[in-house]
Amino acid sequence: RRQRQMCIRDSDDTALKSGDVVLFDIGGRNRNYCSDMTRTFFWGEPDEETARIYDIVRRANEAAEALIAPGVRMCDLDRAARDVIENAGYGKYFTHRLGHSIGLQDHEPGDVSLVNEQVVEPGMTFSIEPGIYLPGRTGVRIEDLALVAENGVEILNAYPHDPVRLD
């Protein structure tokens, strides 16, 4: 994945230092169905730009999630999140689609992207995962799973969007 090459590295035995950003992308299975969630944490106090980026990504996530309902197009969800990021001046650093469908596989057909005009329907489950990645410097992503209901959406992740310091 392009974002991995830009700012995310696999774990190793490097000691964390104050200001480091730690991104957890985790998932599991229950009755053969997959889950997927990403949260970004800080080791110590984040620098000013990283804190600002975190807030932008959180607002982008929440803008897309607020729009999810039957009849809305996938591309409109991506546009809602992307507009928040672009209006903040970080558009070129949001380098991937907004999300992906999920079910028996962790990535199923049905991208939440600018090019997918598919209409959201009840029963669909997909991720909402905006991110900003500054090459060699920092990166933030917040990912939730959304289950579309008849009259809206149920966010399947219970973990909050508030920034968390791990130290």
Where would I find each of the regions flagged by the language model?
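Active-site neighborhoods and metal-handling regions in enzymes and metal-associated proteins
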Residues: 2-167
